[in-house]
Amino acid sequence: MTRLLSILAVAIFVAACGSKSDDAGNEPPLYPNETPELRFLINQYADYYEVPRPLVHKVIQRESDYRPKARNGPYYGLMQILPATARNMGFRGKPNELLDAETNLKWAVKYLRGAWLVSDGDMDEAVQWYARGYYYEARDRCQLVETGLRTREVAKRCR
């Protein structure tokens, strides 16, 4: 009888370990103003640019509180990116196009990736680099190409 109970306990344990977990259960609930469609886009661009999803959410929450049409002075959209910064990352449209959530995420998360690299994986530091700019830090670390700011390094020691 003891052997049967032991076998049953092991079988239950193995079955529980083998069950597929629901990835949606790992996602935090939607933030105020966030929609499922917006969450999908955020995750898509975070994964594409290899930036932690929580970092992208942190920047969006800080910059626009999940409002794609947010404007503050010269800054546009979800991640409050400057049109000049977006152009530096490859954007070729009109500034108002940055009020489209997907367009904003495409260029702003690309820029955030550089802040993430310069921060050496420190999320709070990455937010600060994103907000104040990281060109000179990337230049001094020979990371202009890696961060996407330039197609070649400008410092002679980096070439």
Sequence positions of predicted segments:
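Substrate-binding/active-site groove segments that recognize
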Residues: 74-91
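Solvent-exposed loop/turn segments at secondary-structure junctions
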Residues: 64-67, 85-88, 133-136
